[in-house]
Amino acid sequence: MATADLTVIGLGNSELDDYAQAAAAEQGRSLRPDAEPEKGFYYRSDHFNFAKQGVPALDPDSGVEYVGKPADWGAKKRDEYTEKDYHKVSDEIKPDWDLTGAVDDAQLLTMIGYRVAQADKYPEWKAGSEFKIKRDEMMKGTSSRSSMP
């Protein structure tokens, strides 16, 4: 099912979010931050190992504003899934799931990847990001790892 939004875990940390914002706008969609940052998803996701090394990485998640559904429908479905299935034996694709919105997400992520690949410079962390220092050191060639004996 298509959404009018896309959740970005850690939204606002890097210039990748600017790429995501532009791509989402072209699709007539918006970005929204993680609704539950206190759960630490940013620090538990696959992209975190890139971030720890100073490499900006995008962590997209499904939106919650489903086209043609009441405003709270997506959040209710997410909560229902988390309670009943998340990390349980039943955590599998269900035959009644409508995955057509995944095409929009895949196209958005492809646009981002293409634009990053065509850009003149690598995406950077934004001021205030805890990973910016590591990236700045890396780009200068003076990271603590490279200076080790």
Which residues make up each language-model segment?
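Short, solvent-exposed mixed-charge patches
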Residues: 140, 146-149
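Metal-dependent peptidase/peptidase-like ectodomains
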Residues: 1-83
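Charged/polar, solvent-exposed surface patches and flexible loops
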Residues: 18, 22, 26, 88, ...
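Amphipathic alpha-helical surface "interface" segments used
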Residues: 40-48, 127-142
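His/Asp/Glu-rich mid-to-C-terminal helical/loop segments that flank catalytic regions of hydrolases
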Residues: 64-135, 148
